[in-house]
Amino acid sequence: MTPATPLNLLISNDDGISALGIRTLANTLAEAGHQVTVVCPDRERSATGHGLTLHRPIRTEIVEGIFDPRVTAWSCSGTPSDCVKFALSAVLKERPDFVLSGINHGSNLGTDVLYSGTVSAAMEGLLEGIHSIALSLADYTSHNFQPAADFAVKLLCQLMEKRPHWAIANQDAPVLLNINVPNLEKEKLAGVKITRQGLRRYIEQFQKRQDPRGKTYYWLSGEVIEELPQPDEPNIPLDFPTDVQAIAAGYITITPLQYIMNDLHRIQTLAQEDWQI
């Protein structure tokens, strides 16, 4: 799908500069006619959340030979959030139209987003007032990122076409869309579903191990709890499924997120009490 107007796109991730997911996404968007700049960690940075690098230097370098020649790429020794901050402050001469993060190797559903470097890179774009998209392939075993990249191209076209309808109060307030794509052939996809954030938990275990020198270390492992009741959201109709539910039904999920985490119900309840110094 050729865009009516080529967009200026910044792409980052948390899987690192050599990851197939970001290479597939960046090259596909460049082939579609967009101006693409990649700034991402120089190594694996999964589950770093919204961490920043403080009190030590951040090193960067231009990367050649990995991406399509039309893509400008940088690697950064910092976190995904560092990468987006660096790109916006020191690399890009013009403000990007969108910040994209991914394609992550594995899902970012429900409460995963609190730990996700992928979502945090997109959240950094949102904090800077830029429309942002986090993309994840919801399968740790598959390396077929192309369907998710193709969907990103189509989604950007649709977002630009529908902009007057999804801009909040016609003020074009920035939006963050967290997108998860099932590992299914296109004809087997159930469709695209707007979802609310769900709940995801793991059976976690710290495995005690020993290194070759006999020193003890621990390795965190875990399995997803599949049958977990999903929470109700008083401000969202119940006919909106959670991202966890919709991905299980074979849908591409689009979950709008924000960085304001107020608990409105508790604010109202606690404000009715008399609190003493």
Curated annotation (Swiss-Prot):
Enzyme Commission code(s) on record:
3.1.3.5
* Primary localisation category: cytoplasm
Compartment(s)? Cytoplasm
Q: Where does a divalent metal cation bind?
A: 14-15, 46, 104
Quote a single Gene Ontology cellular component term: cytoplasm
The UniProt catalytic activity note for this protein reads: a ribonucleoside 5'-phosphate + H2O = a ribonucleoside + phosphate
Q: What Pfam families does its record include? A: SurE
Identify which cofactors the protein needs according to its UniProt entry: a divalent metal cation
- Domain of life of the organism in this record? Bacteria
Write down how the cofactor binds this protein: Binds 1 divalent metal cation per subunit.
Listed A to Z, the keywords are:
Cytoplasm, Hydrolase, Metal-binding, Nucleotide-binding
The molecular function GO annotations come to: 3'-nucleotidase activity; 5'-nucleotidase activity; exopolyphosphatase activity; metal ion binding; nucleotide binding
Do you know which SUPFAM superfamilies this protein is assigned to? SurE-like
User: In which family does this protein belong, per the annotation?
Assistant: Belongs to the SurE nucleotidase family.
Report the function annotation for this chain.
Nucleotidase that shows phosphatase activity on nucleoside 5'-monophosphates.
Name of the protein described by the UniProt record: 5'-nucleotidase SurE
Organism, by scientific name, is: Picosynechococcus sp. (strain ATCC 27264 / PCC 7002 / PR-6) (Agmenellum quadruplicatum)
Q: What is the lineage of its organism?
A: Bacteria, Bacillati, Cyanobacteriota, Cyanophyceae, Oscillatoriophycideae
